Swiss-Prot record:
Ranges of residues in domain MPN: 267-404
MF GO annotations: ubiquitin binding; ubiquitin protein ligase binding
Cross-referenced Gene3D superfamilies: Cytidine Deaminase, domain 2, Phosphatidylinositol 3-kinase Catalytic Subunit, Chain A, domain 1
GO biological process terms, semicolon-separated: mRNA transport; protein transport; ubiquitin-dependent protein catabolic process
Subcellular location: Cytoplasm, Perinuclear region; Endoplasmic reticulum membrane; Nucleus membrane
Top-level taxonomic group: Eukaryota
Entry keyword set: Cytoplasm, Endoplasmic reticulum, Membrane, mRNA transport, Nucleus, Protein transport, Translocation, Transport
Region (Disordered): 89-113
Organism: Sclerotinia sclerotiorum (strain ATCC 18683 / 1980 / Ss-1)
Protein name, per record: Nuclear protein localization protein 4
CDD domains in UniProt: MPN_NPL4, Ubl_AtNPL4_like
Amino acid sequence: MLLRFRGPDGTVRIAVEANETFGQLGDKLLKLLPENLDPRTLTLSNAPSGGEVKLLMEIARAKVSQIGLKNGDMVFINYKLLDNLPNGNSTTSTSTTHSSHLTSSTNRLNGSAVLPESIPVNVPAQAVTSPSEKIKNPWEVVQQSDLDNRLDKKDGKIPRKRDTKMCRHGEKGMCDYCMPLEPFNAQYLAEKKIKNLSFHSYLRKINSATNKPELGSSFMPPLTEPYYRVKKNCPSGHPQWPEGICTKCQPSAITLQPQEFRMVDHVEFAQASLVENLLVFWRSTGAQRFGYLYGRYEEYTEVPLGVKAVVEAIYEPPQVDELDGITLNKWESEKDVDEMARLCGMERVGVIWTDLLDSGAGDGTVICKRHIDSYYLSSLEIAFAARLQAKHPKPTKWSDTGKFGSNFVTCVVTADETGGIAISAYQVSNTAVEMVRADIVEPSADPAVMIVRSEGDDDSDTSARYIPEVFYRKINEYGRSVQENAKPSFPVEYLLVTLTHGFPSDPKPAFMAKNSFTIENRLVIGQEQDIKDVGKQLGLDKNGQLTQSSDGVLAVSDFHLLCYIYSMGILSKEEMALLCRVATQHDLADGYQLIATPGWANFLAILQSTG
């Protein structure tokens, strides 16, 4: 077949066989690309932008036929160029080294030989760098959120009143019975039934053990993200994996245990109508619905040094909804919606979807599928949540890599044990994120278990994947804690962190429009956003003037309306920023300033012309 490859330096055509590997294809491709190309950075994609991007080295052992390429297909490539090499230095030595590598069965953990065609694309030797990309002095260069900076300045101590029975001192004194407790005090957490430490409480706990200023030792970042992949450019001098491996570059065995902390403690929905809109769709169609949560992070005072995600809006991207699942389509306006959220002082904080099945009793009850004897979040959903958390890392100066975990949350609207509709909020552990990123685990047909991949699978490029030993501890039938091998599968609860959720007792939502604007991507139930609906939402008459029934500045206080106006492209960036300020802060002075702008006048004229 003939394949076309379009990149920064033009388009090339290569003839390949369906049974050839991408490693063989890469060797042909490199001959047609610039000589100073860095093969480590060569990526393939099915679209010029927004498509699925894969490093060539990651799929070097996959066959062309497995990817689904056909004769004449266009593949989009991208790469980076190396600095010009000095005279006399070339990559021939590297090529010679690759060709002379041993291919004995001892080079593969499962005993199979490393064939020449399965060797990765030749790459020039580079300086030894850490695969985890550690940052020197992260506390000087990493930009944390304002919330993290505020919590860092707090001591987090839990105050206690004077104990009338045990304290022998006066009102101004202090003893062991009334002195403030550390935010990670186990007894206090048990009394308050707090299952997981907050992130900043956990940070205080491990920092007190890692850094001891009284000893005069230099500061060390106390946080380290798990890393379960083979380290590249091992200083021991042996061939790179999969041809060679040693104890310095291979990951250690993994022992799964419940994560003792959570990055976010609570999810707060600013108003009940946010979730109700999802339920309206389910009641109309019986199909499930998915949405992205937009809001902000605030301090959560119910737990020591806690953090909560405050959800102000739910945006429903393009999707195909079914009775038992959801398929997400390509989201063209993703960057625009994120920009609108930023102008409103928000960010993407999580996802939410429904999993509801009517009981058929006619009383509004639903069937409870998620409970202690089945599962709470399926293995497929955990893998999905892990990928989303990996895309939204949390920047922190307390980690040697400048990031640690994620504040991204996952919510499911499902049935509780009484048949009522309830919300459950979760995160997956940092271990789960890295295991998914390292391709160690994969979802199972049984939603309650996660499968540990096998290194020698023939139907994928697992030959380049190192699978460390994975264990977990459980209580056996005799009440003893025993260690079990996680292969071939293990329970998903070892990867799950449970959050609390709720609604404010005194709601003060940012978006307060009395009449909600049509929600996007609901054409399947006959709802479509239209420019005429904008005039109705704003309370305009046929002449483009505000009617007496207009809600004033509150009329524009709707996130879906703002996104639609932004998509029209009429207002400038400054005018959109002003509109978002009016929508979220509800200031009349800003409203009059918006009305006086030329962009708003053009906008009203367009509304008037469309009737």
